């Protein structure tokens, strides 16, 4: 379990997260919803260890506790943490002309027995991760020439390579933290990526937290929803329980209604 308890984050005297607690369970996809500036990326940064709880970090005051598999997050050294959790940040374009394959192989360095010494098996994992991300055709491409959506798929393959389970070895629960992974993707690739995330959460025993802006995507692909507003969780639970007009209005300040899609999966959320 990845736990955050009573998180308080403030920057320049302004509260960003206020007494927030959340649990990310292995084998479960949790979608984090909220309007712009609600604190979603800040929460993901604290859970990733980029904003350590218990003091000042990057100009922010962070208080509260974060534990990964029962161990305080701050007590886990960087190499081991990189094997236990992977982070896909919001889109950033590489400044150097790496190939897509080289970017994906970056996810394997935490597993190298010697610094910088990747193996043939690491190369095979990179190829399989590219295939899972629907990015095999991009393998040899210079990443500075890729579109936003193509680059997003390559970076998704990188975090898959980072958490790829070794054959025949028992693994502790691991965690995948995704910051708007579908933002640059077309409709088909949005659903393909989230389908893959949900399947791997079960097959690899991953706890997943993904920030998404479209509640309809969350309704179809998440096991749990957490809604964030003004730095606090205002609703959390199963999609059918949370994605209702009243909680959505509290989260977004926007009135909606639910329309039966006729497929028995989830209603469609549309403006009221």
From Swiss-Prot:
GO CC entries: plasma membrane
Keyword Translocase tagged: yes
Compartment(s): Cell inner membrane
Limits of the ABC transporter domain: 2-255
GO-annotated molecular function: ATP binding; ATP hydrolysis activity
The protein's assembly and partners: The complex is composed of two ATP-binding proteins (HmuV), two transmembrane proteins (HmuU) and a solute-binding protein (HmuT).
Family to which the UniProt record says this protein belongs: Belongs to the ABC transporter superfamily. Heme (hemin) importer (TC 3.A.1.14.5) family.
Protein name: Hemin import ATP-binding protein HmuV
Native organism: Burkholderia pseudomallei (strain 1710b)
